[in-house]
Amino acid sequence: MTSKPLEHVADIEKSLRHIAAIIKQKGREILNQYAITPPQFVGLQWLYELGDMTIGELSGKMYLACSTTTDLIDRMQKNELVERVKDPADRRVVRIHLLPEGERIIQEVITKRQEYLRDMFESFTDEEIAIFEKSLMKLQHEMKRK
């Protein structure tokens, strides 16, 4: 594969950065309707997608120190969004479990974020959306691979 012209890569990087910032801002506006912080949302999102996790596993996914994640979980447990449960296979292991209220909030927030994106795609044809989705998935795959 030949090297892509740097100006195209620079334009794509700039567009992705701007899109990410807009989505992040819109996501925060949506989160302001709920009693959770952006880091709590990220933690809830990982638990929703992957199921019960240890503090260490969640810390790794969130790129946070275990002590920071512990404080985050303490606050979410106090608000009855998550609970700590002993692993039945190894009682020394404690897993973080998403409670119904945490699941409700994460589902509502994700739905509102998806509705926002759907509105942004109103002027796109079905073919453009399919190509865009395929390209994003390919980029994500390459980024995970390297």
UniProtKB/Swiss-Prot annotation:
Domain HTH marR-type intervals: 9-141
Protein name: Uncharacterized HTH-type transcriptional regulator YsmB
PROSITE patterns (UniProt xref): HTH_MARR_2
Keyword field: DNA-binding, Transcription, Transcription regulation
Biological process according to GO: regulation of DNA-templated transcription; response to stress
Keyword Oxidoreductase: no
Gene: ysmB
Record's keyword annotation contains Transcription regulation: yes
Species, as recorded: Bacillus subtilis (strain 168)
A family per Pfam: MarR
The entry's DNA-binding region: 55-78
InterPro entries found in the cross-reference section: HTH_MarR-typ, WH-like_DNA-bd_sf, WH_DNA-bd_sf
Molecular function GO labels: DNA binding; DNA-binding transcription factor activity
Gene3D superfamilies xref list: Winged helix-like DNA-binding domain superfamily/Winged helix DNA-binding domain
